[in-house]
């Protein structure tokens, strides 16, 4: 069996990612792995076809990234401080592409992802980042559905 030394946990601050942390902690403890937590901010330049001055989009993007980094720092203090080996990353772009890029760049051995459980038209329109990762990742992917109350 391949040694698991680096685990990637992509997060979406809009979702309750904390509900997945017991599972993440179990895997990290089991393998003694370093946990990489990644947040991917949407690239706002794709909205440049609308009439918005380029400088405004760039400034807003910089503010969004700064806010994401600030949120990540808060999340580390509130929810992730129990992980002894922790790396955090904030990237800008398409979520699936940036996750796969991080896997390659960091030599990730396992990905743990929460899934939204979208169905029907919403899934057709928005697709599933988790589906794209499962299909394309060069390493195993564990997907976790949120528990229903």
Kindly label every feature range from the protein language model.
Residues 3, 102-149:
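Gly/Ser-rich helix-loop-strand patches that form or flank binding pockets
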